[in-house]
Amino acid sequence: MAVSLWQQCIGRLQDELPAQQFSMWIRPLQAEMDGDTLVLYAPNRFVLDWVREKYINIINQFFTEQMGSDAPKLRFDIGSRPSAKKFEPAPVATVRAPNTQTKATVGTYFNTQAEPIANANHRSNINPTYQFDNFVEGKSNQLGKAAALQVAENPGGAYNPLFLYGGTGLGKTHLLHAVGNGIIKNNPNAKVVYMHSERFVQDMVKALQNNAIEEFKRYYRSVDALFIDDIQFFANKDRSQEEFFHTFNALLEGNHQIILTSDRYPKEIDGVEDRLKSRFGWGLTVAIEPPELETRVAILMRKAQESGINLPDEVAFFIAKRLRSNVRELEGALNRVIANANFTGRPITIDFVREALRDLLALQEKLVTIDNIQKTVAEYYKIKMADMLSKRRSRSVARPRQVAMALSKELTNQSLPEIGDAFGGRDHTTVLHACRKIAQLREESHDIKEDYANLIRTLSS
């Protein structure tokens, strides 16, 4: 009875919570009765603590509404309910003896004649240097890291497939490798394959050329976990999409983990079949956004520490405030500073950094101005540039104006009064309100979150 009530509660939560929150925190929970107590199993401590803090009152309220004083007690535990199916390595397949007349090697990942596919090394290409421990977490990537951690602990479970999307250089590939390392640590025999989508296409083409398509299928469908980076490169490659469609289905039916990354939201990927885009969203879709200031500073400090360099706090903030687009750009700039310091023997100060990065900083200041932000936002929302400066308060105009103010605060070094002046002489408190409002809406509204991320990418590219 109580387990059935939990299913009703799930239905209520699904209606009330944003889809991403529901998928992230509620869907992984498993329920089982223990006497008069309903035990909710969370996959790890992170989820358990989050649900206790954020959702326990909603759950208890629902139970009380439905059963009054007969409502079951609640207890939380970590793990799976005893009846839950656990992750197992993929079964070893058998294949025919190789055709000795076939001489060509197909791709990098399997050979048409060297050895039976089942016994071949599934070359994972998992980079051991990419771990969760050295992934700098911030608000922009917190959900992505949490989801990746859960997949590493319970591959083939609730988040399957896991789809990570965001601009270049934001850490999506790092998370893929971290998951792979986590799975292999827990199960050294697991067959984990990481690749760029173009490698999948190249392997399939070579398999077709060498009449080895069956070996290709057996190889990819016998892995325990398949991670494909930059899935958007499947666009307009119909045969590759067809083969991946069947590979995807086979792996999912066997409860084997799939993680995909892209530079855009699944439904926005042009040239990919709708049936594939639909499947990309079956599990959990998480945005990886450009890092906020505090995370950018932490990334610089971590990188400097790894390089054995003492980076002053004020220098880290100086760089982080001016380079905002992605982690790769930050690390490249720091490497340049370190190289210059080693070459000249000069201490790393703000003046030294300003000189070492003068061309890069000049380019950034030229590209990101309040005027440029206003024009970009106006074009994005299809409003007139004059509306940015007007007193109109209709939502169709006011919301884009607030977005532009928030972007100006984040992407330029202008003060709140200066931003207000640029928006028709508004008071600095109006700008502050706009920034807070957009920050709130990015948490609550998927559309605003997407719009903001798209504009950041456009302005930072």
Curated annotation (Swiss-Prot):
One Pfam match: Hda_lid
UniProt xrefs under SUPFAM superfamilies: P-loop containing nucleoside triphosphate hydrolases, TrpR-like
GO biological process, one term: DNA replication initiation
Top-level lineage group: Bacteria
Coiled-coil segments on the chain, per record: none
Places the protein is found: Cytoplasm
SMART domains: AAA, Bac_DnaA_C
GO cellular component: cytoplasm; plasma membrane
Record has Cytoplasm as a keyword: yes
CDD domains noted in UniProt: AAA, Bac_DnaA_C
Location of region: Domain II: 84-124
Sequence segments annotated as region (Domain I, interacts with DnaA modulators): 1-84
Region (Domain III, AAA+ region): 125-341
Family: Belongs to the DnaA family.
Written domain comment of the UniProt record: Domain I is involved in oligomerization and binding regulators, domain II is flexibile and of varying length in different bacteria, domain III forms the AAA+ region, while domain IV binds dsDNA.
PANTHER family: CHROMOSOMAL REPLICATION INITIATOR PROTEIN DNAA
Role: Plays an essential role in the initiation and regulation of chromosomal replication. ATP-DnaA binds to the origin of replication (oriC) to initiate formation of the DNA replication initiation complex once per cell cycle. Binds the DnaA box (a 9 base pair repeat at the origin) and separates the double-stranded (ds)DNA. Forms a right-handed helical filament on oriC DNA; dsDNA binds to the exterior of the filament while single-stranded (ss)DNA is stabiized in the filament's interior.
Protein name: Chromosomal replication initiator protein DnaA
